[in-house]
Amino acid sequence: SQIVITHGTDTMTDTARIIANGNIEKTIILTGAMIPYKFGSSDGLFNFGGALAFAQSLPPGVYIAMNGRYFDWDKVKKNRKTGVFEEL
């Protein structure tokens, strides 16, 4: 009853909101990469690994996992200047 979704970061919070409004009783983690994989130094694999770990330990709900942290879907935003997701 855990789901990890890889997703583009520009609309990740929008997708998280839509999923959360569906009232699905699962632990759903969205994650992605701020640096595309093709550039070689992507953060995508690190974020994916974190998302897998968070999926095993968090209660049902919708979360975003980026930069070694997890956030409730409605308490996070992407900071395009710094290249990280930040808690609201």
Describe the predicted segments one by one.
Residues 1-88:
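Active-site histidine-anchored catalytic micro-motif
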